[in-house]
Every structure is written in structure tokens, then in C-alpha cells.
């Protein structure tokens, strides 16, 4: 699963997830993309589950790009531990997702297969997504 090799600090503040995505909001590498319509958090497990679903559907042909990376640690205190005594240990890693962010890209397959693969991937994700194509410049 994806997670940073090194971080300057082990734990982070929560922070707010506001605004729209400006960076990573267009299809850059492939021909087709899966774009988020809502804000939310995407865990490393969800990123991997969606990638596996797409890869299996396209039968390993074409190329898939993952455009997001889980760089935010989420901490959790153990069960039945009283409040206080510091912040809990890192449980998993997430990526903050803003509306308009391209999550995955694909090329080398037909549009019909890409749509089906992205539909399978979207069912693994906790927010609404849409299918987008690369616009000619």
C-alpha cells in the first residue's frame, strides 16, 4: 500500500478540506480520467482497491496512472484507553480530495472499456466521481 517513505513529522493536525482542486484538475498523462465531484478522504486501501478493480477489468492492457498519493497520517488511540496522555499512534494514511481532482488516468483501451473500469473503481470510493476525457489543446 502507498505511504511516504519518510516524513519530517510523524503526526499532523486535522486541518479543513475546503475549496476546489486547481492542481491536478485536468487529464495530463492518459486519454481518459476519473474525476472527483465531492470532497473527502481517500485511504491507501481504497486507492489500491480501485486500482486492482481497474487493472483486472482492462486485463492488464493499456496504462493506468494513479494521480493521488496518501501523504496525511491518521492517528487512533487504542480501545479502552482513557482520554489524555498524548495523541494516538498512526493508524493509516489518507489523501485529502477536493472536488475536481483527477484521481486516475488511463490510455491504450477503448472508451467503453475505460468507462466500465472507472465505474468499478468508483464503486470502491467514498465520494461521487465522473468520467472525463482529455480535451484537445
From Swiss-Prot:
Pfam families: Ribosomal_L16 (PF00252). GO terms for molecular function: rRNA binding; structural constituent of ribosome; tRNA binding. GO terms for cellular component: cytosolic large ribosomal subunit. InterPro entries: Ribosomal_uL16, Ribosomal_uL16_bact-type, Ribosomal_uL16_CS, Ribosomal_uL16_dom, Ribosomal_uL16_sf. Keywords: Ribonucleoprotein, Ribosomal protein, RNA-binding, rRNA-binding, tRNA-binding. One of its GO terms (biological process) is translation. Transmembrane segments: none annotated. Belongs to the universal ribosomal protein uL16 family. Part of the 50S ribosomal subunit. Binds 23S rRNA and is also seen to make contacts with the A and possibly P site tRNAs. This is Large ribosomal subunit protein uL16. It comes from Colwellia psychrerythraea (strain 34H / ATCC BAA-681). The gene is rplP.
Amino acid at each position: 500500500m502507498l505511504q511516504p517513505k519518510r516524513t519530517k513529522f510523524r503526526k499532523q493536525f486535522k486541518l479543513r478540506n475546503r475549496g476546489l482542486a486547481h492542481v491536478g484538475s485536468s487529464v495530463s498523462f492518459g486519454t481518459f480520467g476519473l474525476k472527483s465531484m465531492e470532497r473527502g478522504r481517500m485511504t491507501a486501501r481504497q486507492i489500491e482497491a480501485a486500482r486492482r478493480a481497474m487493472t483486472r477489468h482492462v486485463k492488464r492492457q493499456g496504462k493506468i496512472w494513479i494521480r493521488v498519493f496518501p501523504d496525511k497520517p491518521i492517528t487512533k488511540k487504542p480501545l479502552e484507553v482513557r482520554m489524555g496522555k498524548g495523541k494516538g499512534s498512526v493508524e493509516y494514511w489518507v489523501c485529502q480530495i477536493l472536488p475536481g481532482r483527477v484521481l486516475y488516468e488511463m490510455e491504450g483501451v477503448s472508451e467503453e472499456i475505460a468507462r466500465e473500469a472507472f465505474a468499478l473503481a468508483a464503486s470502491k470510493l467514498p465520494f461521487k466521481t465522473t468520467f472525463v476525457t482529455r480535451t484537445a489543446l
